[in-house]
Amino acid sequence: MNAVILIPARLDSSRLPKKMLADLDGEPLIVRTWRQALLSNHAVRVVVATDSPEIAGALEAYGAEVMMTSPHARCGTERIAEAARSIDADVFLNLQGDEPLIDPRNIDLCLEPFLADNPPDCSTLVYPLLPEDFQQIDDPNVVKVVLDRNGNALYFSRSPVPFQREVYAATQFYRHIGLYAFSAEVLQHYASLPPSMLEKAESLEQLRLLENGFSIRCVTTTVDHPGVNTPEDLDLVRRMLRRSAGR
């Protein structure tokens, strides 16, 4: 397997403007994400795809490989698909730029289905939620996923799925961890498709795959980490970094 990690990064964010350049213990957030990606054992290359000269400059100051992409990408997967057209690889992993604490073991876990004889169209990670995690289950910023018996995604939603008529304890909920591995062919096919109805309704780009008949293999991980979507998330990550540094 010849796998390349592509990190899409844009400057504008409705919930947390310029979050990619937010300071995390002296480094931009996007640099932290790039450094974690370099620790993967399965990937041979890490590239950041951006349309922002400001983000590119911040990364290049640390020696990161950057590809400039069109400002017209409608989502991160379209952005990495553009970059992937000039890279020779079998598999591309889309790592969100706002994951500065991503564990490299999760990156490798997401890529492992592509080591099998019959690889999926796409793979991603899910983290099991407990009944006491009801705040996450109800939080629209936390994406939930329901699986079939073979571990393939049936649906992703910002709503609590599956709906419970009685109590949350009656079923298993999973939180989606937003990194994806694609075959090179499926990635380009994805980018050629228009945004789908459910994708636009939920604002979840992975639904474009499901609506068009592609499978998404979901691998369960026990290694959790917070992404950065809101100011509260950013404060949490800063506190975690201070604790890990003994401050």
Curated annotation (Swiss-Prot):
GO terms for cellular component: cytosol. The keyword Transferase applies. It catalyses: 3-deoxy-alpha-D-manno-oct-2-ulosonate + CTP = CMP-3-deoxy-beta-D-manno-octulosonate + diphosphate. InterPro entries: Cytidylyl_trans, KdsB, Nucleotide-diphossugar_trans. It is found in: Cytoplasm. Its EC number is 2.7.7.38. CDD domains: CMP-KDO-Synthetase. Pathway: Nucleotide-sugar biosynthesis; CMP-3-deoxy-D-manno-octulosonate biosynthesis; CMP-3-deoxy-D-manno-octulosonate from 3-deoxy-D-manno-octulosonate and CTP: step 1/1; Bacterial outer membrane biogenesis; lipopolysaccharide biosynthesis. One of its GO terms (biological process) is CMP-keto-3-deoxy-D-manno-octulosonic acid biosynthetic process. Keywords: Cytoplasm, Lipopolysaccharide biosynthesis, Nucleotidyltransferase, Transferase. Pfam families: CTP_transf_3 (PF02348). Disulfide bonds: none annotated. Activates KDO (a required 8-carbon sugar) for incorporation into bacterial lipopolysaccharide in Gram-negative bacteria. PANTHER family: 3-DEOXY-MANNO-OCTULOSONATE CYTIDYLYLTRANSFERASE (PTHR42866), 3-DEOXY-MANNO-OCTULOSONATE CYTIDYLYLTRANSFERASE, MITOCHONDRIAL (PTHR42866:SF2). NCBIfam families: kdsB, PRK05450.1-3, PRK05450.1-5, PRK13368.1. Belongs to the KdsB family. This is 3-deoxy-manno-octulosonate cytidylyltransferase.
